[in-house]
From Swiss-Prot:
InterPro entries membership: aa-tRNA-synth_I_CS, Arg-tRNA-ligase, Arg-tRNA-synth_N, Arg-tRNA-synth_N_sf, ArgRS_core, DALR_anticod-bd, Rossmann-like_a/b/a_fold, tRNAsynth_Ia_anticodon-bd
UniProt-listed Enzyme Commission number(s): 6.1.1.19
Name of the protein: Arginine--tRNA ligase
Gene Ontology biological process terms, A to Z: arginyl-tRNA aminoacylation
SUPFAM superfamilies: Anticodon-binding domain of a subclass of class I aminoacyl-tRNA synthetases, Arginyl-tRNA synthetase (ArgRS), N-terminal 'additional' domain, Nucleotidylyl transferase
Gene name tied to this protein: argS
Primary location group: cytoplasm
Subunit structure: Monomer.
Phylogenetic lineage: Bacteria, Pseudomonadati, Pseudomonadota, Alphaproteobacteria, Hyphomicrobiales
Broad enzyme group: ligase
Amino acid sequence: MNIFALFEARVRDAVEALTRAGHLPEGLDLGRVVVEPPRDASHGDLATNAALVLAKEARANPKALGESLAAELRADPRIVEASVAGPGFINLRLDPAIFHAVVRDALEAPEAFGRARLPGGPINVEYVSANPTGPMHVGHGRGAVFGDALCNLLVAAGRQVTREYYINDAGVQVDVLARSAFQRYREALGEPFAIAEGLYPGDYLKPVGARLAETHGRALLDKPEAEWLPTVRETALGMMMDMIRADLAAIGIRHDVFFSERTLQESGAVKALLAELRAKGLVYEGRLPPPKGQLPEDWEDREQTLFRTKEFGDDSDRPLLKSDGSYTYFASDIAYHRAKYLAGATELIDVLGADHGGYVKRMQAAVKAVSDGKATLDVKLCQLVRLLRAGEPVKMSKRAGEFVTLRDVIDEVGRDAIRFMMLYRKNDATLDFDLAKVVEQSKDNPVFYVQYAHARVRSVQRQAREAFPDADLSVAALAREADLAVLSDPGEIEMMRLIAQYPRVLESAALAHEPHRIAFHLYELASALHSFWNKGKDLPQLRFVNATDRKSTWARLALVEALRSTLAAGLAILGVTAPDEMR
């Protein structure tokens, strides 16, 4: 049950009633009308901006319109009080039975509770797409966790999602990888080797060299580069992708599709794209003005094959061919996004590092062009991650050619800490990740605080079974028998309110593509539970389990089970475990 959607519909009914009565003009735009929690919980359970956003179009005084709407809403028996505050906000206080119904809904259908059915076609989410030239670093991990949680969130909101990884295996960097691996092959055979400037120096390529030596012996040594390069490249790429897949699996990241850039080019998709754009009149031969500021060393004033991206909102037109006649990265990227659209996706989401900020407008313009406006692209940029230890910066490089990898961090703090903390800040804000703080058992460590709330409910349930060994304490029995009307303490009411807010949080997070909203709400739920627990330490009558008060115990067991299942559902979206015990 989503009470916000329920009462938003009720507010719309009130507007329609005033329209039928001739007090409001017909055809008002209700698109900006929302029902949300009030800023101050003492003002009520819900608030709506209906009078404020409709007043101008209706040529009415916002406060007077608010009073008229409030009068209509008071006729609903589920609304105990409707009052106008400030310039025209309407605050609603609900019959407690509404919140009792939410708790029972969470108990009776925990798998469905909070889930939405948002409209829309298939979505393609591309995330990680790290170059297959070495181990993943912590920045890759942030994009990976964000993308995976976003997919989980969209699925929970009823959307059809394809999870995709784009393997950049066609650029210059993979030839550099092969040449670097060849030197490790020479090393494995005891031959002189040199990691020249421009090659990848890391020890992570030593196993590649050993594999090549084991497979080919000395057969590659005397061959010219043109002959050994494809063989070495395939082995190195395969082993790098195996390493990346293993790191992703270690933090629970999964993909449905691994799409190869090389297969895109070999299939003729880029050539077909250019032909299509030419047929649409979107490609021309021309010159670009010099870029502002200091000119790059490789800039040339020459005639180029240009894509008319300015017509679709970009800052300038973009080249599709390099001076040597090969395709630009942009041309390949357009062909790749065209392939996603042709595969059926009408909404595309790219999760990229913050250094791709200049890429957004041109790619959105390209998607609009190749889909004739039928597909959209949302680019989510993930800012940098700063590694700290007890507040002090961690040196990111360990030795020449080596750096702190995602696997290093996984091994030190574990999957749950990484996933929760990567999502406990908005993706476009820099994240300080403190290796010491994320394993603390304190309120200041959000992942511990939320997981401990889940474990604490399980502890309460074990206590209840000890106190009432012969009672049926199953979830079904609690949903059927608990008298939730006895829940009147402000702490109990706050827990019910937060449970009721979860469906709205999930839906709004999915619409905004912002999984951090789930993490924030879980912390609020955990905080409400822990606060009430602490009250019970001083006031025995407020303890969750009271052997002499079966009625209150049953009601509180029902309440905390609803809260626990909500925590578990939210943690599942984040990809974090919901432990029954904390050790």
